[in-house]
Amino acid sequence: MRTFIDVLRDNAVHSDRSVTFVRAAGEERVVGYPDLWHEAQRRAHAMAAIGLQRGDRVALVLPEPDEFILTFIAALAGGFVAVPIYPPQTLAKMEAYGDTVRHVLAASGANVLITTDALRPMIEEHLVRGASTARVVVERDVRSAAGFEGQSPEPVSLDDVAFLQFTSGSTSSPKGVMVTHRNLSVNSHAIMFDGLQSTPADRGVSWLPLYHDMGLIGFVIAPLYALVQVMFLPTMAFIRRPSLWLDAIHRFRGTITFAPNFAFALATRAVTEGQARSWDLSCMRALGCGAEPIQPDVLRAFLGRFAAQGLRPESILPSYGMAEATLAITFADVTAPLRTDRIDLAAMRAGQARPSSGDGAAMELVSCGRPFPGHELAVMGPGGRPLGERQVGEVWLRGPSVTAGYYGDPAATEETFGGGWLRTGDLAYQADGELFICGRAKDLIILNGKNYYPQDIERIVSRIDGIRDGQCVAFSRFDDAGAEIAVVVAESRRNTAGLAAAIVSAVRGEL
């Protein structure tokens, strides 16, 4: 097995291969594979020149896709450990952003942070305020490598840590997942060849954030590993104007793209007939969905909305994964239409995924497919007891995509990775060998001895007239008497006095 850096070096002979960067201002920059490899070597040389040594952690806060990707690959090529940090999105939340940067720097031990001229003053201010000793270097200085004459860095080992992927921190403080070069090679190969069945004729289109594993591994590392060309769009440009995503697929003749569930809902709602009229989306063969709960109604609405543009039902490709498994764990069949399972809600709350008979409350779940070859997936009950077909339990995984644990946190590593299995914290069941995700174990709401999934409550509330689509959250807390109660927070499009009563009625009526 070769490292990603070995593969990238060998692929540099393909002068007909390139990546395209669309910057925030709209201009496009095309970088061929030979130039990509040369630039990675040059920047790795510059990083060594500023004092970085092999194994040192280096934080990256770079908003533009080309700046980030070229510097990230350079860090891997030089044997440094990259630490991606998302760039600030709004001035209104700078205090919270500063807290995040300081936490990641402290947790990773990074003593160098590379950013832009524009962001440097703000970042330095927050580091001084937090008494951080990290040195801030501008990307421009890494770009201009004095004394570089094309020399290659020392080779990296498969078991070296390539980068730290910090978790989202949705249920705890963000932790740095140690992703090795072996993890990257194994998972990239599985994604591109087992999951996507890709060839060099494929073309990827992505607006996904590059500091997140789906954007970084799924559309930088894996495609470069497999000689697949990619067009990168600025994330915020998609959020402001969703039509840019589908327009890029049309223009670039994209065959592979991925997005979270919310993006499909946003595009369905926001794209106008005038924008879509000239598109031909028949080129798209793998329209992947993951990173958050997948709603089948949203995917069907998206397919229906763009069927006239040639989008095919079998192009929808649900998947499941997490940073602790590098990226991907399961893929649905890339050649088959969407598969769903409608199950009885009462039975599921009792831990059984029984198909609905049509009577009583039910919910529809999406198949996320099967685990990759060479990996073992099991659904476990309490105490690590393997569960059978259609029994709901926690997803456990073992295999070469499972990462090396959390950097500097042996207790959390033992809790999640101990005993040879990755305990994902996700609840699911298997049916006919395929995985159906139900929710997060830590998110379960237990009322009067019954289990309720927040996603079920949120799905019901989102359908109520007056509630903004996707803008609600359900959770539990304990009241003054010590009893667990359910709480729903929802954003309304208008001030409706009876909305709270409507929410209570709808949830009680369906659950």
Where in the sequence are the language-model features?
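AMP-dependent adenylate-forming
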Residues: 6-31, 162-164, 171, 321, ...
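Conserved AMP-binding/adenylate-forming
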Residues: 285-287, 294-434, 442-444
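Conserved pre-ATP/AMP-binding loop-to-beta segment of ANL
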Residues: 17, 148-166, 172-173, 183, ...
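Conserved AMP-binding/adenylation subdomain of ANL enzymes
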Residues: 185-203, 213-255, 270-275, 376
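Flexible, low-complexity linker/hinge segments
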Residues: 1-2, 102, 139-161
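AMP-binding/adenylate-forming catalytic core of the ANL superfamily
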Residues: 250, 257, 399, 404-405, ...
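Structural core segment of the AMP-binding/adenylate-forming
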Residues: 49-50, 77-146, 260-261, 266, ...
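Conserved AMP-binding/adenylate-forming core of the ANL superfamily
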Residues: 19-65, 69-73, 90-99, 153-155, ...
